[in-house]
Amino acid sequence: MKQDRFLVGILVGIAVLVVVALAVFFTRRGTQAYIADDVPEGVVHNYVLAILNKNYEKAYGYLADLENKPTYEQFRDAFIKGVVNPNNSAIDVGKSEINGDTASVEVGMIYNPSDPFSTGYRDVQHASLIKQESSWKLSSMPSYYFWDYSWYQEPPK
């Protein structure tokens, strides 16, 4: 009889832990929010979040108006067709360094492991921004998960 109560207690404890874990999982999902984009790191954060939310129009608004800028259709199609695929990585936006009308933002790329026995890895690079009409705009991002390297490149002749 004591063993039955003990077993029931263990099972109830496990059930409570499972319910708590599920509650935490579902309440934490989607808690990312847009932040002020008056600083370079805010622009990078909001660009990445817009891409992850598939809000390509908002993300496109963060691109600098430079020569050979992709059209909105080219930009959107790169994500829709999978040329640029952000699903296998995450970004940690770090500090920015501003020098006049240019800025560099530390971007930590966090890559998922390719199999269950590997660990992911982190690679720190920098996004480049320029100030246009008093707003910070992206001129390059270090990752092909969020940026197509053909953007802003002169087309081949």
What does each of the following model-derived ranges do?
Residues 13, 36, 81-84, 113-117:
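Intrinsically disordered, low-complexity segments enriched in polar/charged residues with Gly/Pro
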Residues 2-53:
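Short, low-complexity N-terminal intrinsically disordered segments enriched in polar/charged residues
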Residues 98-157:
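Exposed beta-sheet edge and beta->alpha loop/turn motif
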Residues 42, 46, 56-106, 110, ...:
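Short solvent-exposed beta->alpha transition segments
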Residues 1-2, 136:
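The identity of the second residue at the extreme N-terminus of proteins
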